Amino acid sequence: MTPLIFVTGGVVSSLGKGIAAASLASILEARGLKVTMVKLDPYINVDPGTMSPFQHGEVYVTDDGAETDLDLGHYERFVRTRLSRNNSVTTGRIYQNVICKERRGDYLGATVQVIPHITDEIRRCIDEATASFDVALVEIGGTVGDIESLPFLEAIRQVRIERGAERTMFMHLTLVPYIAAAGELKTKPTQHSVKELRSIGIQPDVLLCRSEQVIPDSERRKIALFTNVSERAVIGCPDIDVLYGMPLELRRQGLDEIVIDQFKLSGTASLADLSEWEDVVDAIKHPLDEVTIAVVGKYVDYQDAYKSVGEALKHGGLRQRTKVNLKWVEAQDLEGSDMGALKDIDGILVPGGFGDRGFEGKVLASRYAREQRVPYFGICYGMQAAVVDYARHVAGLEGANSTENDRQSPHPVIALITEWRTTTGEVERRDEKSDLGGTMRLGLQEQRLKAGTLVRELYGRDVVGERHRHRYEFNNRYRTQLEDAGLVIAAKSMDDTLVEMIELPREMHPWFLACQAHPEFLSTPRDGHPLFIGFVKAARARKAGGKLLREVCV
């Protein structure tokens, strides 16, 4: 059985369980172990696909088309394992599975209850996601004490009883607040959080103590004494300047050794080589250049809605030792034709979104970038905005629009995808009356790049795969008309039915590119992504007056 590390949180939410778990996973991976991660979310939605970005942040998409929590994005940025729908489990999905089994008669007339049926289904999902790995980390969403989390906590308690301490570890992330008026760190919240956890039968093996500053040894000893945790296993997690430095911090405190010792993996695990993370941190701390990118979006008041976009831009910068400053611009604010927010920036990125609010602002941002020759990168809705702008103002298609926003448009250059082929070869069909949840073109889709284009140059190969999440697409009825007006169809689906990327000829614009997919989901700090690296390079060139000041790379 795969050794499991269960990660819980206490005192308050948003302490960074996902980052801490992913950082530990990256160290174990660096020691030669095959690692995976799972997120257990206590909300009743089947998945986050229909949840408001203002409440939940971005919806992260995996290769197999699962719409998941943004924590899976953190996981994939820290470890090289590609995750799937099995790695994201919600209360809604658990209950849906159990109810389907009950309707089929799988329980043979039994009264279906939280224990054992719900907890058994949770355990089954954990086993399914973690089989065949050397180690798996399982994060339980929410905070200990929340009523929604109780079935998950009961399930992992049962796992510990069944597998024992050599195959399970409980890691609890808690807060050690600093009270400025008293000039002291307070350990009482941590003690109470562990007490709450122990009341439901779970004794932590490791405590990760979040704090604003380094926790003195005397306080660590106190925490260990009153929580029944070894002093060695009380790990301080102070605020750090660089998020991607967390693996180095946890390694410095020997957290991976605690895991190796408890699971008796010393014969399997090699010494950790964290040189890649050292390079990443060094590039972030010591940039040689700096650019400012305007992100024109609909949900900029809650930047977690664009978490992967922001991270991918930073990755693109650190691969060339460039600090990327993000200027968040509300798309609606541009609809009065005041482009002041886009002045003195080095590049414009228009990310994805849904609905008509702010769409005209995105179209205007595309037009501004095109006419002012500012590097432009459109993603999903950002590509659709660029197509609408080009159709209206270059191709002369007055009233061009997306049918998502105007079903009576005389020139619907963007329209609902009614049929497409999945990666398994099955044909999917949709119409305007289809459910919203799980009905989009989702997951990794291959596309063929056109020879001689900017995207072909950036990727360096003819066929690439990118993750998608969209319901509307470039209308093929206008393909020839827009190409005749100068628009370049830079990539198409493998069956030639869907337009995947567009760009402008380089004699018309130095760097204008847009894609229907979401390349931000495949960007990592150690590797970056060709499109984001190219975009930041173009922004550097604009800042330098058309010529790069210095070629640098990590």
From Swiss-Prot:
GO terms (molecular function) for this protein are:
ATP binding; CTP synthase activity; glutaminase activity; identical protein binding; metal ion binding
Give the Glutamine amidotransferase type-1 domain ranges.
292-545
InterPro entries attached to this UniProt entry: Class_I_gatase-like (IPR029062), CTP_synthase (IPR004468), CTP_synthase_N (IPR017456), GATASE (IPR017926), GATase1_CTP_Synthase (IPR033828), P-loop_NTPase (IPR027417)
Query: Which Pfam families does this entry report, sorted A to Z?
Result: CTP_synth_N, GATase
User: What regulates this protein's activity?
Assistant: Allosterically activated by GTP, when glutamine is the substrate; GTP has no effect on the reaction when ammonia is the substrate. The allosteric effector GTP functions by stabilizing the protein conformation that binds the tetrahedral intermediate(s) formed during glutamine hydrolysis. Inhibited by the product CTP, via allosteric rather than competitive inhibition.
**Keyword vocabulary terms for this entry:** ATP-binding, Glutamine amidotransferase, Ligase, Magnesium, Metal-binding, Nucleotide-binding, Pyrimidine biosynthesis
**Where is ATP annotated to bind?**
14-19, 71
Per UniProt, Mg(2+) binds at: 71, 139
Q: Which reaction does it catalyse?
A: UTP + L-glutamine + ATP + H2O = CTP + L-glutamate + ADP + phosphate + 2 H(+); L-glutamine + H2O = L-glutamate + NH4(+); UTP + NH4(+) + ATP = CTP + ADP + phosphate + 2 H(+)
Q: In which pathway does it act?
A: Pyrimidine metabolism; CTP biosynthesis via de novo pathway; CTP from UDP: step 2/2
Q: Which GO terms describe its biological process?
A: 'de novo' CTP biosynthetic process; pyrimidine nucleobase biosynthetic process
A GO term from the CC aspect: cytosol
EC category = ligase
The residues responsible for catalysis, as annotated, are 380, 518, 520
Residues recorded as binding CTP, renumbered to this chain, are 13, 146-148, 186-191, 222
What start-end ranges are recorded for coiled-coil regions in this protein? none
**Positions contributing to L-glutamine binding:** 353, 381-384, 404, 471
Q: Where does UTP bind?
A: 13, 186-191, 222
Q: What is its EC number?
A: 6.3.4.2
Q: How does it assemble?
A: Homotetramer.
Q: Do you know which HAMAP family this protein is assigned to? A: PyrG
Additional information: CTPSs have evolved a hybrid strategy for distinguishing between UTP and CTP. The overlapping regions of the product feedback inhibitory and substrate sites recognize a common feature in both compounds, the triphosphate moiety. To differentiate isosteric substrate and product pyrimidine rings, an additional pocket far from the expected kinase/ligase catalytic site, specifically recognizes the cytosine and ribose portions of the product inhibitor.
> Which family is annotated?
Belongs to the CTP synthase family.
NCBIfam families attached to this UniProt entry: PRK05380.1, PyrG
Described by its record, this protein's role is as follows: Catalyzes the ATP-dependent amination of UTP to CTP with either L-glutamine or ammonia as the source of nitrogen. Regulates intracellular CTP levels through interactions with the four ribonucleotide triphosphates.
> What's the protein here called?
CTP synthase
- Record organism: Xylella fastidiosa (strain 9a5c)
